[in-house]
From Swiss-Prot:
Family matches, as NCBIfam families: ispG_gcpE, PRK00366.1
Catalytic class of the enzyme: oxidoreductase
Note on how the cofactor is bound: Binds 1 [4Fe-4S] cluster.
Pfam family, one: GcpE
Cofactor requirement: [4Fe-4S] cluster
Record-stated family: Belongs to the IspG family.
InterPro entries, A to Z: Dihydropteroate_synth-like_sf (IPR011005), Enolase-like_C_sf (IPR036849), IspG_bac (IPR016425), IspG_bac-typ (IPR004588), NO2/SO3_Rdtase_4Fe4S_sf (IPR045854)
Name of this chain's protein: 4-hydroxy-3-methylbut-2-en-1-yl diphosphate synthase (flavodoxin)
SUPFAM superfamilies hit by this protein: Enolase C-terminal domain-like (SSF51604), Nitrite and sulphite reductase 4Fe-4S domain-like (SSF56014)
Keywords: 4Fe-4S, Iron, Iron-sulfur, Isoprene biosynthesis, Metal-binding, Oxidoreductase
GO molecular function: 4 iron, 4 sulfur cluster binding; 4-hydroxy-3-methylbut-2-en-1-yl diphosphate synthase activity (ferredoxin); 4-hydroxy-3-methylbut-2-enyl-diphosphate synthase activity (flavodoxin); iron ion binding
Amino acid sequence: MYNLSSIIRRKSTRIYVGKVPIGENAPISVQSMTNTKTTDVAATVAQIKALQSVGADIVRVSVPTMEAAEAFNQIKQQASVPLVADIHFDYRIALKVAEYGVDCLRINPGNIGSELRIRDVVASARHHGIPIRIGINGGSLEKDIQEKYKEPTPEALLESAMRQVSFLERLNFDQFKISVKASDVFLAIHSYRLLATRIDQPLHLGITEAGGARSGSIKSAIGLGILLSEGIGDTLRISLAADPTEEIKAGFDILKSLRIRSRGINFIACPTCSRQEFDVIGTVNALEKRLEDIVTPMDVSIIGCVVNGPGEALVSTLGVTGARNKSGFFEEGERKGRLDNQQIIDQLEAKIRAKAALLDKKNRIQINQL
């Protein structure tokens, strides 16, 4: 497929969350966060595995209490994906999970306490060889910054971020990434743009509290899409009030749309009209659900008639062009036969799986190639 993309990634330093590289032109990693009670070890482990099954590179787990920290110890032993511990208010929890082998600590300067406490967290991170994510959020800025700016502004988020960066620099600690999240799309965009010009550490992208699955995905796609198209961002999370697996799917969809990183099938489908010769919407919905396990990147066009079908099939890995009773099937732009419209879902699924097996290029981050 013709690609007009000319994204030049912002230069950044590299850190590792577990074995996943972040920054310095590493593939943009996609992460999510569990929403189970962390003290429910079985439920949390099950959700981590579900997230991993749809492509999560990193999973964040909230650790609000010492009891949750003890549960985290058990969870970490059962997880094969890198885990980030989300810490607020009590810095001692960060020290405890560091002992338990956490892969990254996420702290919020607005509520973690004094610089002395942050100093202790940094010392622990250094000792255990783990990075820190500094999470700046428009809804929880430090009190003096709130009083100065009266409301969240890009300058307020930047000041909060640079305060922490300067402190970490004084401690000679450079193993960190940083985020400046806001629920307002423009506030987030401008905050990240400002920060990107001031530091070279990796940036964690996100629109915080974006909303439900539909509206939140759209807000995140607009905000993160603009930043990513400008080369800003090294890892991302799509924050949705929905099943966390939807965050991973949305994250990959955004990266896929910008041709930055692909995972699984990119379906190209018409919105349908009276010319469609088979149920396009039902076919696409069924195949998206059936083929969630496919990680091989490929473009599959499903067009209900001959107006645009042949043209889309020409530039797709596989394509279907609607025709009466039997629709045309294309592979790599060449017509390869016809599919029975009554059996089109089963037949197309088989074709896609066969092609995926042939290509066999799993698009996960390959550590040994970086």
